[in-house]
Amino acid sequence: MIDITRDTFETEIIQASMQTPVLVDFWAPWCGPCKSLGPILEKLETDYAGRFILAKVDSDQEQEIAAAFGIRSIPTCILMVQGKPVDGFQGAMPESQVKAFLDKHLPPAGEAAEDDTTYDTESTEFAQISPEAQI
């Protein structure tokens, strides 16, 4: 798990997602649902053993990043692949639903993502986000 700031955003999210999918968790310390989702995400990052990177953005401290992603409620998670948002979800979800979300986008365990893997970046509301242009 990586805590993201404006200074580390480019390296830890955009550049890192070129090699490994990055799940960006927008949260705040006062947010009750964030407190229940956070441990689930951290457990899954361990369980998935390198298939994705968990990056956490404190929306209170990093308002510029949250604004660039159009975050309106927390928790919000956005999956970044090859520098672009491919999908996401809002609100706390049980572990089974988070796993289903991850399994939809990540290569199976033991398989690296193919270089020619394509992601449908047009079909979700998150496709409209262009954070690299605004941060």
Task: Briefly describe each language-model feature range.
Residues 1-19:
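N-terminal leader/targeting and pre-domain segments
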Residues 28-34:
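Hydrophobic heptad-repeat coiled-coil signature
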Residues 16, 20, 47, 51, ...:
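Conserved, well-folded catalytic cores of nucleic-acid-processing
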Residues 72-114:
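Non-catalytic, surface beta->alpha helical segment in thiol-disulfide oxidoreductase systems
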Residues 100-135:
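Non-globular targeting/processing and membrane-anchoring segments
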Residues 2-6, 22, 26, 37-64, ...:
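Thiol-based oxidoreductase modules, predominantly thioredoxin-like and allied folds used
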